[in-house]
């Protein structure tokens, strides 16, 4: 894939010399903006905060306190927290046009919208003591995101808004860490009104994602290939490709194949003219250890804590020789689920096995033509998901 993009760069240079591909090559302005700038660009108010976890990680979170047509000084608006998926960031919820982005639609519907970022991504790469240049900083996975990131962020929102509970919307890994957190931390679970799970991932036994190829490699080989720190960060080269190459119609298919390598995509349900915006904010990075945790999940077919590789390390972390399984049947949070029939990450078979384990399932919808990214990028997402999601929130408020 990198060879294809390098070839695209040469073609771009040659094309510019001869005036080739002049049409359709203007970058969207949001491709060169950060999250706050995108929110402001579309006329919405925003606030930025740093949230510090108990283990010292500093997370960047963003708030859209109200919509464009809503006055700021009114009665408190119900808080909604949106949590992105694997190797992604809060930008996922705002990278489409306002009438197609969940964060903006919620704000315009009268909600106080909060956007989270998992440790190690572009907007959450700080620590009280550790340097991101050190392997120690990157010694985390799903376990720490569920144990530290979600409680810190949710408690911060509750304290800031003065509300006792909030709505939680997660996509992909954003659902995984929620299932873990809400099943192991009953006090945190009590603070959730409804858990909206988009493309939920608890087991990946049947996944067809290229991520599965990691399972064929030993940990030693993975660390030789990727190191022991950051996996798939957003680089200056990525930004160049996004804004100078992928904004051109000629290269959109190549770029989309690169961007959606792990998840797949349907060009018929994406606004391909915004591909430069998608690629300029993704991938946003995670830790190699987190990817090893996902490889472990593929191999085991179960949701369990990270296996540290030897019994001594496991004893130190878990007080037992093997990593414990997570029992999501203990989660009592009202849960609504949407999954896709073409999803190669949250495979329909895995979701089918998940449903009976959810103690309080209040809504379920299978969208036959959906793949993994349609839940936040799909052009028909407002009709397929967001309208019903907002109706469920309104019904909760009325009751």
From Swiss-Prot:
Disulfide bonds join 246-255. Glycans are attached at residues 271, 327. Its EC number is 3.1.1.-. The keyword Secreted applies. Residues 1-19 form the signal peptide. InterPro entries: AB_hydrolase_1, AB_hydrolase_fold, Lipase_euk. One of its GO terms (molecular function) is lipoprotein lipase activity. One of its GO terms (cellular component) is extracellular region. Belongs to the AB hydrolase superfamily. Lipase family. This is Lipase member K. It comes from Homo sapiens (Human).
């Amino acid at each position: 894939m990198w060879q294809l993009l390098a070839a695209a760069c040469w073609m771009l240079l040659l094309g510019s010399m001869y005036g080739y591909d002049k049409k359709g090559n203007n970058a969207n302005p949001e491709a060169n903006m950060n999250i706050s700038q995108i929110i402001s660009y579309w006329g919405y108010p925003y606030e930025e905060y740093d949230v510090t976890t108990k283990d010292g990680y500093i997370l960047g979170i963003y708030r859209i306190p109200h919509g464009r047509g809503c006055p700021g000084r009114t009665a408190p608006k119900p808080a909604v927290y949106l949590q992105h998926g694997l190797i992604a960031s809060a930008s996922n919820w705002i990278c489409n046009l306002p009438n197609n982005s969940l964060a903006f639609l919620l704000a315009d519907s009268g909600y106080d919208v909060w956007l989270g970022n998992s440790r190690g991504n572009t907007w959450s790469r700080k620590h009280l003591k550790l340097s991101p240049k050190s392997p120690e900083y990157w010694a985390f996975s799903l376990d720490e995101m569920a144990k530290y990131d979600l409680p810190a962020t949710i408690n911060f929102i509750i304290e800031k808004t003065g509300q006792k509970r909030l709505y939680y919307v997660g996509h992909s890994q954003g659902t995984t860490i929620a299932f873990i957190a809400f099943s192991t931390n009953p006090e945190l679970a009590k603070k959730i009104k409804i858990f909206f799970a988009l493309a939920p991932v608890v087991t990946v036994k049947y996944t067809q994602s290229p991520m599965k190829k990691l399972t064929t490699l030993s940990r030693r080989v993975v660390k030789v290939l990727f190191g022991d720190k950051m996996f798939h960060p957003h680089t200056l080269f990525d930004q160049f490709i996004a804004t100078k190459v992928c904004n051109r119609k000629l290269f959109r298919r190549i770029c989309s194949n690169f961007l959606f390598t792990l998840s797949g995509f349907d060009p018929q349900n994406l606004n391909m003219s915004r591909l430069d915006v998608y690629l300029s904010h993704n991938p946003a990075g995670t830790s190699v250890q987190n990817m090893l945790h996902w490889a472990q999940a593929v191999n085991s077919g179960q949701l369990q804590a990270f296996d540290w590789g030897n019994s001594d390390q496991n004893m130190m972390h878990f007080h037992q020789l093997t990593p414990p399984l997570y029992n999501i049947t203990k989660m009592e949070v009202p849960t609504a689920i949407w999954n896709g029939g073409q999803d190669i990450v949250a495979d329909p078979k895995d979701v089918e096995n998940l449903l009976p384990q959810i103690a309080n399932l209040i809504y379920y919808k299978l969208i036959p033509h959906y793949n993994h990214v349609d839940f936040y990028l799909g052009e028909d997402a407002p009709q397929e998901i967001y309208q019903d999601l907002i109706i469920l929130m309104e019904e909760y408020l009325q009751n």
